[in-house]
Amino acid sequence: MTKLKTPGTHIVSKKSSTGRRLTATALSSAMMIAASGLTVAEEASSPPTSKKLNTVRIEAEGINYKADRVTSPKFTQPLRDTPQTIQVITKEVFNQQGASTLTEALRNSAGVGTFYAGENGNTTTGDAIYMRGFDTSNSIFVDGVRDIGSISRDLFNVEQVEVEKGPAGTDNGRSAPTGAINLASKQAFLADATSGTLTTGTDSQNRVTADINRTLEGLAGSAVRVNLMWQDSDVAGRDHVNNSRFGIAPSIAFGLDTDTRAYVNLLYIEQDNVPDGFVPTVGIDHWEPQAGLEALVGNPVDSENFYGTRDDHDEVTATMATFRLEHDFSDNARLTNTVRWGKTEQDYQLSAFMSTGGTDEDGNPSGNIRWTDPNDLSSYTLARSNNTFKDIENSIVTDQLNLAVDFATGSVEHNLSTGIELTREKQTSYGVASTGSQPATSLYNPDWNETGDLTSSRSGANSYGQTDTVSLYVFDTLKFGENFLVTGGLRADRYKTQYRNNAVCGGTGRRAVDCGGQPEGTIVTTIDDEAEDTLINWKLGAVYKPVKAASLYANYAISQQPPGGSNFQLSDSVSSANNPNLDPQEAKTYEVGAKWDVVQEALSLNLALFRTDVTNEINSNDLDEQGNPTQSGEKRVEGVELSAVGNITENWSVTAGYTNMDTSVEEGSAITADGTPNLTYSPDEAFTSWTTYRFPSGLTIGGGASYTAGLHRGRDGAAGTPEYTDSYTVFNAVVSYAFTDNLTLRLNAYNLSDEDYVASINKSGYRYAPGTSRTFLLSADFRF
């Protein structure tokens, strides 16, 4: 590989590259490494250098855990010299674990997960990710382009998952206060290779993936790659819930090994799932009975129970087309242009419930849970009256131009990255009208065959959201000798969000819609508004390198989320963050830390202390002269994060992380059901680990543990439901054997102790998602 002539610069010429060389690494528990890392370094007789590891079947065994960089050109330095917490989860990690979705891969990042189960009857769908105290599900990107939609993202075409913690507004524009997630897609390369996996397991889990790459004869520097996926799997420990999907991702590249390279990537995915409405919290720890439900104390329902019907469905179609053109003007200057069009369609129906109790003045049951004999548990029924429908289409078109230049001004070296982005994002939510209903079902023995006369169709009461953005950005890293770097970034986003909501007029109560003189049942426009402004986000960091393999850093960053920035919706409510008259939510993050590569730079250790202050929050405790809430609210997340990734020895790989967070509402009303000042759905402590050892015989054994502290649910009017959840620990394991260079059999085991735990809980506390029960997957990995 030909490196740049200017020392220490980051652009690498493609002229002699035949594909990205993989360096074998892994991540270990920070506390264990602190005690043993130096000893291991001294005892390792064969230091695992990149070159050596690539000669001992690292690619065949697939144990590369460590990535040195993220894929975005906006990050001008290797991870070790980047003053920010960024975790990269490589395909070697999530493939070895048998993970198939983004949510499963993110279990390798401490404190990141799907902890929120929705509001009232609305159940969250897809990758509903929380990170460092805030919802990050609308800050998910694919190859640096926002990926819209509440869907579950498959990993069959993903090279690595990049978790950027801390404000990401300078890198991506509007985003969640505490970070963003990027999925890097697989690309065609100059080699002939075929690989894939056949998987079967408990609860009728079946999956097939294939990855085929071929050079094109007669067309020098060209290659084509096709990734395929098929899956039909029930969910372990959940009756009737099913995930069925198919995907194909062809990629073709031209001009590899030349100064000008072109890539065309396509992606098509279909999902036909039976969604999970989760389980009533009746009888579990911290549940207290409402009137008439006293007999249910200590009698939780079976966590496998399914309370939906055969009519429930989650049908998703995702289509994406990407064209990328790269040109190297020299070894020190590269121009990249990326054009993408993408569309996601979702048709969703769920027979949802709210497990309320209560009795009337005569003592008869009046809630959603009813009975004929209070002492006979088999007589209890649960109403399925909160039917949820989604009929949504999201689309995006973008053109991103980036120029990366390395140069020097006197003795100071610069790694400059600058560009412009033009983006249009649209969302259409089709109104759905329903007639009929689903019958109640047994609380302790529900039957999904009990369907009623519920029907639905589009009503015409649609809502439309669109955001157009023009972005300019510049990043520069200044190197003052070998020991000191300063990295800065500045981004300006000129955006315009337009939103129109239509509704069927009429009705009574708080959801009544004024007809304005029109006949009842007429479709009327309730909101037609827009928001337009310029966001300025920036970050500044400094790195001191006492030695080449270590970095000490400090960083400060500002990120903003404007009204409607997360969901394209605007509101005329004075208490809504989506009111276009309000200022953007602003996040300020301070971070100091250290990064150190030990064991001949094969093992990366990381320590970060961080604090994020989120301001311009709605504060109903502080009213203006008109009696309206003000934006004096403030939230804070601060803590420590430890992680490590790499090889302890040539054959011992490990990945682990630990975080301890203190979350709080600094100004404003408490938002938790138990009245504590914490933020909701955010564990204050979490640990994750995964380690494997490869024997010369071809046998690999490994496993890991993950710990998640309890969660505080949100505040609403629900009574008696759990206000918080308990902590839990889960143990997983893997055993594999390479029969030949071409075939490896792998057995994954999850939740070895069959721990029964609450993985997420909804805002009112009526429903919870049980954790995955003990599961086994047997896979055949092949490679030619």
Show the residue positions of the predicted features:
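C-terminal beta-signal and adjacent terminal beta-strands/loops
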Residues: 2-4, 707-716, 736-784
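Acidic, small-polar-rich N-terminal luminal/periplasmic segments of exported/outer-membrane proteins
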Residues: 3, 32, 52-191, 592
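Outer-membrane beta-barrel translocator/receptor signature
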Residues: 156-159, 170-248, 256-262, 319, ...
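Acidic/polar loop-and-plug regions of large Gram-negative outer-membrane beta-barrel proteins
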Residues: 231-236, 248-255, 259-328, 344-394, ...
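Structural signature of Gram-negative outer-membrane beta-barrels, strongest in the C-terminal barrel
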Residues: 253-255, 394, 413-417, 421-425, ...
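Face-selective signature of the C-terminal outer-membrane beta-barrel domain
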Residues: 324-343, 383-502
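Membrane-embedded beta-barrel scaffold of Gram-negative outer-membrane proteins
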Residues: 326-328, 334-340, 344-352, 553, ...
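Gram-negative outer-membrane beta-barrel transporters
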Residues: 611-613, 630-716, 753, 779-783
